[in-house]
């Protein structure tokens, strides 16, 4: 540090899904490679994808951005995290911790309470770093939300950030999106926009002319990068499971032919072309932890929401959930409970992670009204009792002796994290009758059925551990560092010369 406040670069988008998160990640690594001390920042994130850091939870995007910046992830990098539980209800995480009072408060009433906390976190990062790379949210031109803005132009003006405005040209209307967003900003806000970025372009870039020049004549803002479509950049999209789909495995599933089997059981996890299905219920959480599977050669990963899509899969994953009982009810309404049970009955491998583990058991008991009582799927002889307290911690653990489909994980150590309400234990009556849940990790972190094809664990991040991927698939996948360097190389290649340096130049 030079002793002066950091320069700040901010990535704004014309819409959600424009490419803000990955571009912010790329900028973090680009500036870090120059020997600068870099930190990411996003004032408010709405996502059920979260990571555990010192002090609590932050959005997964900011966690990976910190790693790209070669910085220790910190709750100040995402001071406000909203985790949707229902269509009109979110759990509010402030500086890493659940804030029950804010969770009950109407959305428009929160900004006055949280802005001082956001500003303080940002000011501290500015004082401790050379560059802070800031990510906006949605669009900065939502005029109905402007009075309560705490994440876009209010942040940009607070720091005097050099702002890039990025748009997804693949969806069409890119120039209108850019001009319309710019036009709806105040004059002082427009002065902060230093460049437009056309993301996800396919085809001959010369065909864009004279669009960029005309846009610059109308706004005074140059188009500083045209980024070609890049499906395989290695990072998940933040805003939704089906936005991730084109980047996963070898493609997205299509509906099976009429009369196809709903399940087939028993193949090895090292089958030549394993097909892995993740059930995408409405309140799915931490979906990004499955992203590494798409880098495993030959693996076909698909997201499913109907029984027919489970035809021919080798194994089924029930991921985490922000509303376990509600998502379990949805799963039953779709008929997926019967399809998963049929797959398991035929010997097919089933994995439940966190909320997915809880669903696999016999019952979910909720004495405090957190998630609601519900019968489980009955594929693991365990019972989960929800608790008011929330377990949030990073863990190092090791699998014990596993049988059947998951035997390759025996003795494998892994690093992961817990984010859950509730504790899971064997069903006493079933154990007495000989139906035993086998604890395969210390402290009740993982359970397996006697047959050996159904496994449930509380630890998130299993597929991000190289030892697990090696054990299950015999595969070595690119390291995160290699992914981050690839992102930095990409923007260095496609931005106009000198632009990235000019963004952090002293005025």
Swiss-Prot record:
Pathway note: Cofactor biosynthesis; adenosylcobalamin biosynthesis
Keyword check for Repeat: no
Alphabetical list of InterPro entries matching this protein: Class_I_gatase-like, CobQ/CobB/MinD/ParA_Nub-bd_dom, CobQ_GATase1, CobQ_N, CobQ_synth, GATase_3, P-loop_NTPase
Any one GO BP annotation for this protein: cobalamin biosynthetic process
Superkingdom of origin: Bacteria
Residue ranges of domain GATase cobBQ-type in the record: 273-468
One example GO MF annotation: catalytic activity
Record PROSITE patterns: GATASE_COBBQ
Keywords on record: Cobalamin biosynthesis, Glutamine amidotransferase
Residues at the active site: 354, 460
Record-stated family: Belongs to the CobB/CobQ family. CobQ subfamily.
Protein task: Catalyzes amidations at positions B, D, E, and G on adenosylcobyrinic A,C-diamide. NH(2) groups are provided by glutamine, and one molecule of ATP is hydrogenolyzed for each amidation.
NCBIfam families per the UniProt record, alphabetical: PRK00784.1 (NF001989)
Name of the protein this chain belongs to: Cobyric acid synthase
Provenance organism: Polaromonas sp. (strain JS666 / ATCC BAA-500)
Name of encoding gene: cobQ
């Amino acid at each position: 540090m030079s002793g002066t406040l950091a320069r700040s670069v901010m990535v704004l988008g014309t819409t959600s899904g424009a490419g803000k998160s990955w571009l912010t990640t790329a900028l973090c690594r680009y500036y870090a490679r120059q020997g600068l001390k870099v930190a990411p920042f996003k004032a408010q994130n709405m996502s059920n994808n979260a990571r555990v850091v010192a002090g609590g939870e932050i959005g997964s995007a900011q966690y990976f951005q910190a790693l790209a910046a070669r910085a220790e992830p910190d709750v100040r990098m995402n001071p406000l995290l909203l985790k949707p539980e229902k269509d009109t209800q979110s759990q509010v995480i402030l500086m890493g911790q659940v804030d029950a009072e804010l969770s009950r408060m109407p959305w428009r009433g929160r900004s006055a309470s949280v802005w001082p906390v956001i500003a303080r976190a940002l000011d501290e990062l500015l004082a401790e770093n050379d560059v802070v790379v800031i990510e906006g949210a949605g669009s900065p031109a939502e005029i109905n939300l402007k009075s309560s803005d705490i994440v876009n132009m209010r942040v940009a003006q607070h720091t005097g950030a050099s702002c890039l405005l990025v748009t997804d040209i693949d969806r069409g209307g890119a120039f209108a999106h850019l001009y319309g967003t710019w036009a709806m900003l105040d004059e002082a806000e427009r002065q902060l926009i230093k460049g437009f970025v056309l993301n996800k372009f396919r085809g001959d870039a010369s065909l864009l002319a004279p669009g960029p020049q005309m846009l610059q004549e109308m706004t005074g803002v140059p188009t500083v990068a045209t980024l070609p479509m890049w499906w395989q950049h290695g990072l998940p999209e933040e805003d939704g499971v089906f936005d991730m789909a084109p980047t996963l495995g070898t493609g997205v599933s299509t509906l099976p032919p009429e009369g196809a089997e709903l399940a087939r059981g028993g193949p090895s996890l090292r089958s030549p072309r394993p097909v892995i299905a993740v059930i995408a219920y409405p309140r799915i959480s931490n979906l990004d932890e499955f992203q590494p599977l798409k880098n495993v050669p030959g693996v076909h990963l698909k997201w499913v929401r109907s029984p027919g899509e489970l035809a021919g899969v080798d194994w089924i994953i029930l991921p985490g959930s922000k509303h376990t009982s509600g998502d379990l009810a949805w799963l039953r309404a779709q008929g997926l409970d019967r399809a998963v049970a049929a797959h398991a009955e035929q010997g097919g491998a089933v994995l439940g992670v966190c909320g997915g583990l809880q669903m696999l058991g016999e019952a979910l008991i909720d004495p405090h009204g957190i998630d609601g009582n519900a019968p489980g799927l009955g594929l693991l002889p365990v019972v989960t009792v929800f608790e008011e307290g929330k377990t949030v911690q990073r863990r190092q653990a090791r699998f014990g002796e596993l049988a059947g489909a998951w035997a390759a994980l025996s003795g494998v150590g892994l690093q992961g994290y817990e984010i859950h309400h509730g504790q899971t234990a064997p069903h006493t009556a079933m154990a007495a009758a000989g139906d035993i849940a086998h604890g395969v990790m210390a402290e009740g972190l993982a359970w397996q059925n006697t047959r050996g094809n159904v496994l449930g664990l509380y630890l998130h991040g299993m597929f991000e551990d190289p030892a697990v991927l090696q054990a299950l698939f015999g595969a070595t996948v690119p390291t995160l560092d290699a992914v981050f360097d690839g992102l930095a190389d990409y923007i260095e290649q496609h931005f106009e010369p000198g632009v990235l340096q000019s963004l952090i130049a002293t005025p």
